[in-house]
UniProtKB/Swiss-Prot annotation:
Example of a GO cellular component annotation carried by this entry: periplasmic space
Protein name, entry field: Neopullulanase SusA
Phenotype on disruption: Reduction by 30% of the rate of growth on starch.
Gene name of the record: susA
Family note: Belongs to the glycosyl hydrolase 13 family.
Keywords from the named record: Carbohydrate metabolism, Glycosidase, Hydrolase, Metal-binding, Periplasm, Polysaccharide degradation, Signal
Role, per record: Neopullulanase that cleaves 1,4-alpha-glucosidic linkages in starch to produce disaccharides or trisaccharides in starch degradation.
Top-level enzyme category: hydrolase
Lineage summary: Bacteria, Pseudomonadati, Bacteroidota, Bacteroidia, Bacteroidales
Known pathway: Glycan degradation; starch degradation
Binding positions (Ca(2+)): N138, N143, D144, G164, D166
Annotated active site: D331, E360
Organism of origin: Bacteroides thetaiotaomicron (strain ATCC 29148 / DSM 2079 / JCM 5827 / CCUG 10774 / NCTC 10582 / VPI-5482 / E50)
Keyword set includes Signal: yes
């Protein structure tokens, strides 16, 4: 009888005993690992698991100090701050103790790569090639659909669906990209976007430390970066600190309400970011512009929360250290908190002094954009610490200039002259990202019918690749891909022909391109290969002249070498007097890099309709 009674008591106690000896379920550890020897010795580790906030936390580690344990409103989170100033590479345990229950979380502090802090960023010697990974090439069809992910279909006939492009597809065409002559690739976001729809573009991140499995793995991305670098190509990674995807665990089960603006409640942004530098702006409009959300499915981070700020900053440093990327393009830069973003840029620069960051600064004019660049006189005494900003106004001017007739006072190439004459507003004009189009705008050619006019293409490319700044080319421009934003963003991001195994046309191969496509490709390739390693273009001073008879003339000069460009901005032949240009014409003849012929420069110069001379001295 006593034995039976004891047995019954044990059965009743089993659930409790299970709770005493079981370990907590840890769902996320971010970052997943770190490195010893970083310049900033502080490490934030975010732990996410079932009701872990009541745990006593300790470390089983050598020379690592647990500085702070911060509970959040949500009992499923703990935020740890560690001091690694004396730590060597090691494996250690984070120990959570709740009563008699103990959980050990293994953690690795890795050895840094040799010269990791010396990673070389992109600059005005580079040309970036922008790729939307889902739309470039499908190198691994087996990862098109991943069981359990929310968007479980691939449909190349639907502009807003996933099409199956991936990292392997990009890797397979690195030789094509390098042969074109660009020196860097910028990838639209590759981090996990486990959203129900529209996940192809990547701008609704659900895990900041994980490559989307439909693109590949973290290791595959690191391999892509290494192979690209080996072929002379830098890699720029797209990041988003302003917002995440609504299926991100940080939003679905918020650590605290103040991790997101408006306590996680949807309030639409006004998109009026000019309020941030407007001396007359109301507090209300400033707040709505910056704290408001892009969409219901893109909750807006509160970067004023120190834990959020550190989480985001560390995530970017983790990718630089892990994958060896050469640059970051920060999406919607002015929509995030100014002070936090300035802190981020400074933190990255302190760890990687040669690194570069470009912020998406989509504002209506150069005055507004200049505010966001490092050392801006307009922002003083504040400083964004952002080295490079995107020159959207120049894009707008270029998309008009090469369609119009040029006079001495307006229209056509006068737009470019007048716009560049205002570069005084920029603290670092050579560090502006310049482009004809990108994944958010109409392509430079809006329809296939427009592509018959290659004069427009050739003049625009010549200007883009010889003026000040860091040029960016959107994938497919070299084969005259065309699209109009009026028809929807999905069509701006069409598949590259030949990127999929069953494509009927493969434009990676010259034999399958039309004569016009090959002419366009060859022209771009010639300019890009000439520009590569050209110090005159990378470092040279710019001097220009107001258009005369519709002809725009400018010089790039570095040391005793120079390049002089003549662009005829009219549909008729023009003859110009060369006397006004003698200060930039050191010889009576010069070699034209495009025709590979000598051009006489004695008294006058005649330029046929829409002609280009690219002269080297």
């Amino acid at each position: 009888m006593k034995r039976n009674l004891l047995f019954i008591i044990l059965l009743l106690l089993l659930p409790g005993l299970h709770q005493v000896f079981a370990t907590s379920t840890i769902k996320k550890v971010a970052p997943t690992f770190w490195w010893a020897g970083m310049k900033n010795p502080e490490l934030q580790i975010l732990l996410y698991g079932d009701r872990i906030s009541s745990a006593d936390v300790s470390l089983s580690a050598d020379n690592i100090t647990l500085q702070e344990v911060v509970k959040q409103e949500n009992p499923n989170y703990l935020v740890l701050y560690l001091d690694l100033s004396k730590a060597a590479p090691q494996n250690f345990d984070i120990i959570l103790k709740q009563g008699k229950k103990q959980t050990k979380i293994p953690y690795e502090l890795k050895q840094r790569r040799p010269n990791a802090s010396a990673v070389e960023g992109f600059d005005s010697s580079d040309v970036l090639y922008l790729i939307m990974p889902d739309r470039f090439a499908n190198g691994n069809p087996s990862n098109d659909i991943i069981p359990g992910m929310l968007e479980g279909n691939v449909d190349r006939n639907e502009p807003f669906a996933r099409h199956g492009g991936d990292l392997k597809g990009i890797e397979n065409h690195l030789d094509y990209i390098a042969d074109l002559g660009v020196t860097s690739i910028w990838l639209n976001p590759i981090q996990e976007n486990d959203m129900k729809e529209g996940s192809y573009h990547g701008y609704a991140i659900t895990d900041y430390y994980q490559v989307d499995r439909r693109f590949g793995s973290n290791e595959e991305f690191r391999k892509l970066t290494q192979e690209a670098n080996a072929k002379g190509l830098k890699v720029v990674m797209d990041m988003i600190f302003n917002h995440c995807g609504s299926d991100n665990y940080l939003f679905k089960d918020m650590p605290s309400k103040d991790w997101f603006n408006f306590e996680g409640n949807y309030v639409q942004t006004s998109f009026k970011t000019a309020t941030q530098m407007d001396p007359y702006a109301s507090d209300y409009e400033k707040k709505i512009a910056i704290d408001g959300w892009f969409t219901l499915t893109m909750p807006d981070f509160n970067q004023r929360n120190r834990h959020v700020a550190t989480y985001l900053i560390q995530s970017s440093i983790w990718w630089i250290e892990y994958a060896g990327i050469n640059g970051i393009r920060q999406d919607t830069h002015p929509y995030a908190d100014f002070d936090m973003m300035a802190r981020w840029c400074k933190a990255v620069n302190e760890e990687y002094p040669k690194f570069n960051i470009v912020g998406e600064t989509w504002l209506g004019n150069n005055v507004l954009i200049s505010y966001w660049q490092k050392d801006s006189r307009l922002a003083y005494p504040k400083n964004s610490n952002l080295p490079t900003v995107m020159d959207f106004p120049l894009m707008e001017e270029m998309n008009k200039a090469f369609d119009e007739e040029t006079t001495e006072w307006n229209g056509g190439l006068f737009r470019l002259y007048e716009y560049l004459s205002q570069d005084i507003v920029y603290s670092h004009p050579m560090s502006l990202l310049t482009f004809l189009d990108n994944h958010d705008t109409s392509r430079f050619y809006r329809s296939e019918a427009d592509t018959k006019n290659l004069d427009r293409y050739k003049q625009a490319l010549t200007f883009l690749l010889t003026t000040r700044g860091i040029p960016q080319i959107y994938y497919g421009t070299e084969i005259l891909m065309a699209a109009d934003k009026a028809n929807g963003d999905g069509l701006l991001r069409c598949d590259f022909p030949g990127g999929w195994p069953n494509d009927t046309k493969n434009c990676f191969d010259a034999a399958n391109r039309t004569p016009q496509q090959n002419e366009a490709f060859s022209f771009m390739q010639k300019l890009l290969q000439w520009r590569k390693g050209n110090e005159v273009i990378a470092k040279g001073q710019l001097k220009h002249f107001a258009p005369n008879k519709g002809v725009y003339v400018y010089e790039r000069k570095y040391g005793d070498k120079s390049v002089v460009v003549f662009l005829n901005g009219n549909d008729r032949e023009q003859t110009i007097d060369l006397v006004p240009y003698q200060e930039i014409l050191p010889a009576s003849s010069a070699f034209d890099l495009l025709t590979e012929k000598k051009v006489e420069l004695r008294n006058e110069l005649t330029l046929p309709s829409r002609e280009i001379y690219l002269l080297s001295f």
